[in-house]
């Protein structure tokens, strides 16, 4: 879809696949990715309705393990906020949630418009401090069933992709790891097209640009197909040179 957006010309995914396959550029995956989730029973229909939060572990050579706290919008898959922590406490969760509310402007809206929070049953997520903070913010807290990680499939999958990418290189300082995480989040939010989002980026969906982009892509596709038909008709309308010479003789 980036080719369509940048070159203003439509090429189907099937055509791209055939070309890559012919050049032996389609490789088998190094591992089979297991789906992290089925479908959430109460699906979101717009951004800022439900936020998923979770921790994951990342190692810094010579420093030990650090904890990455992430807040992800359920509908758009947009990473709203993240924070690298040396601990995994309730205060680390709220320290990530605070900028998530501010960045979206949700700290200024009425309570009934606040997003719900979906988390697992980790110690930091069932702590009384977090419950008090959520109550003060007017946010509803939903916790997944124990030993049922697929409830948070989107954020679990995002963390796994991040670790697969980042663990290819060692980080020797917290600042270096933060730079890697920042680059990954920037790529996933603003550059990577998600098939589940109609080949839009998370930012396109989160900030409401998706419908306009899809409409423009549809227009480009119609224009491209019309041009191809005209070119085909023009080519078939011209007599073959050998046949033309035979007719003249």
Whereabouts are the PLM-identified features?
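C-terminal domain-tail junction helix/linker
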Residues: 128, 135-139, 160-249
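Mobile genetic element proteins and their domesticated derivatives, centered on retroelements
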Residues: 16, 54, 71, 77, ...
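Active-site beta-loop-alpha junctions of metal-dependent nucleic acid enzymes
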Residues: 60, 64, 83-109
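An active-site-proximal beta-strand-loop segment
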Residues: 52-80, 86
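RNase H-like polynucleotidyl transferase catalytic core
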Residues: 30, 114-121, 135-154, 168-174
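Basic, flexible linker segments flanking DNA-binding modules
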Residues: 1-50, 148-149, 206-210, 215, ...
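Retroviral integrase
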Residues: 48-49, 78, 86, 90, ...
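Acidic/histidine-rich, metal-coordinating catalytic segments
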Residues: 97, 108-126, 145-147, 198-203
């Amino acid at each position: 879809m980036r080719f369509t957006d940048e070159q203003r010309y439509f090429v189907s995914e099937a055509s791209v696949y055939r070309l890559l396959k012919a050049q032996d550029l389609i490789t088998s995956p190094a591992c089979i990715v297991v789906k992290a989730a089925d479908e959430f029973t109460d699906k979101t229909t717009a951004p800022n309705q439900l936020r998923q939060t979770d921790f994951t572990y990342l190692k810094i050579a010579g420093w030990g393990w650090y904890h990455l706290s992430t807040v992800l919008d359920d509908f758009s898959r947009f990473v709203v906020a993240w924070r690298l922590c040396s601990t995994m406490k309730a205060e680390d969760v709220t320290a990530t949630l605070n900028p998530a509310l501010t960045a979206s402007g949700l700290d200024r809206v009425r309570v009934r418009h606040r997003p719900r929070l979906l988390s697992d049953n980790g110690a930091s997520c069932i702590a009384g401090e977090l419950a008090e903070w959520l109550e003060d913010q007017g946010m509803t807290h939903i916790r997944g069933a124990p030993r049922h990680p697929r409830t948070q499939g989107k954020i679990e999958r995002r963390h796994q992709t991040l670790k697969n990418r980042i663990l290819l290189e060692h980080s020797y300082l917290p600042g270096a790891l933060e730079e890697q995480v920042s680059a990954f989040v920037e790529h996933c939010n603003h550059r990577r097209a998600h098939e589940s989002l109609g080949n839009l980026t998370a930012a396109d969906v989160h900030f409401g640009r998706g419908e306009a982009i899809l409409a423009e892509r549809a227009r480009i596709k119609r224009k491209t197909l019309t041009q191809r038909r005209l070119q085909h008709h023009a080519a078939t309308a011209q007599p073959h040179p050998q046949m033309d010479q035979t007719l003249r003789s």
